[in-house]
């Protein structure tokens, strides 16, 4: 049967900027998520996220609710990256993956809204390379234009679907869809072009990361540091002193 995802939005507040406290936002999310579960949704879709702290708050509410009820549903987290390549508060895709990877109950990490599929390619490529679980992408139908004072999305269903075909066959994307500007015709064409395809296998690179609000940093140094041990001491190691005196540096 079709799966019903309950949409859980970013609210109008950014906790990283002090617009709302963590506890108040968590309480609001808990109330919404409880209502969604009572209504019978199959999936939590925490989407259009623009602040890592807001995501963590929603995940805290979801995990607390799952523990209280003794059961859980799949969780999708979908972030919004502006044309600059960053979330609204400045986080880039490396910060997102580094900060969210420890939350092992995130089933899908996705990108949605703000831009069209073309602008999302480099971010999808990063997720395909570094995110260890399922990847999703739900772009707009291109970037909006102002036509007679109204937003107009020019991307055709065929163009839109061709990007999704690429996402699946080149980057191994598992979940696809559409956001602003997409119409039934866009999604029908996506189904026509993509429904028979299997996601390409991914070779995910595992690496230890640390992250600020803005970017992620690998903890692996290249080149690696040279470790100098106690035996490389001319006073305490006669063999080492003899090698130095013989200028044997091999």
Predicted regions and their residues:
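Domain-level signal for soluble alpha/beta catalytic cores
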Residues: 1-250
């Amino acid at each position: 049967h079709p799966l019903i995802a309950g949409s859980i939005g970013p609210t109008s507040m950014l906790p990283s900027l002090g617009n709302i406290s963590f506890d108040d936002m968590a309480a609001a999310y808990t109330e919404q998520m409880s209502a969604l579960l009572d209504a019978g949704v199959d999936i939590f879709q925490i989407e259009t996220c623009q602040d890592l702290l807001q995501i963590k708050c929603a995940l805290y509410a979801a995990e607390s609710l799952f523990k209280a009820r003794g059961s859980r549903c799949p969780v999708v987290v979908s972030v919004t990256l502006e044309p600059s390549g960053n979330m609204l508060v400045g986080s880039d895709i490396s910060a997102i993956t580094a900060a969210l990877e420890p939350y092992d109950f995130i089933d899908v990490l996705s990108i949605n809204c703000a831009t069209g599929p073309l602008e999302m390619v480099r971010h999808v490529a990063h997720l395909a390379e570094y995110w260890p679980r399922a990847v999703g992408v739900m772009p707009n139908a291109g970037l909006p234009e102002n036509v007679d004072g109204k937003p107009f999305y020019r991307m055709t269903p065929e163009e839109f679907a061709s990007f999704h075909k690429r996402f699946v066959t080149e980057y191994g994307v598992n979940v696809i869809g559409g956001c602003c500007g997409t119409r039934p015709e866009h999604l029908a064409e996506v189904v026509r072009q993509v429904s028979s395809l299997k996601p390409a296998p991914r070779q995910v690179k595992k690496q230890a990361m640390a992250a600020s609000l803005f970017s992620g940093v690998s903890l692996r140094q290249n080149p690696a540091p040279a470790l100098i041990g106690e035996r490389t001491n001319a006073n305490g190691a006669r063999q080492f002193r003899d090698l130095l005196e013989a200028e044997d540096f091999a």
